């Protein structure tokens, strides 16, 4: 039995539910952590106290996605020019 034949046997409600889970999982594990990486890399040295606290909360919330993306992204901050 092929995969597409199996999908056609599933009810439309179940397919909709699987699609919703896939979209939410992609948002949680890929899209929001990428945006968070971008935001932290862009604003690290100019963040205020409240913004930094908010970002740390988001890091805690989206930690699984950040760990998933960490081997592929370089988050080294720019230092003082030391080599």
Swiss-Prot record:
Transmembrane segments: 17-37, 53-73
Stated name of the protein: NAD(P)H-quinone oxidoreductase subunit L, organellar chromatophore
Gene Ontology CC terms, in alphabetical order: organellar chromatophore thylakoid membrane; plastid
Stated role: NDH-1 shuttles electrons from an unknown electron donor, via FMN and iron-sulfur (Fe-S) centers, to quinones in the respiratory and/or the photosynthetic chain. The immediate electron acceptor for the enzyme in this species is believed to be plastoquinone. Couples the redox reaction to proton translocation, and thus conserves the redox energy in a proton gradient.
Oligomeric and partner information: NDH-1 can be composed of about 15 different subunits; different subcomplexes with different compositions have been identified which probably have different functions.
Compartment annotation: Plastid, Organellar chromatophore thylakoid membrane
Disulfide bonds: none
EC number from the UniProt entry: 7.1.1.-
